[in-house]
Amino acid sequence: MTTRWEHKVLTYKLGWKAFDYAQIERDLTVLGGEGWEAVGTLAPSFGAGQAIEIAVIAKRPVGD
């Protein structure tokens, strides 16, 4: 039997000087308690600039 997955993407905007990593950690802790697992990140940047947004991709098995 093949495992079916559901996915979630969390996005975070760059703050005044940095990303709020403490908030990201809190969010991941809550999601982990709900069965979500972070499986990837995206930090797109345009040109020579710094990424202004990051995304965390999570998945968890879908219950039948």
Give the role of each language-model region.
Residues M1-D64:
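Terminus-proximal functional modules
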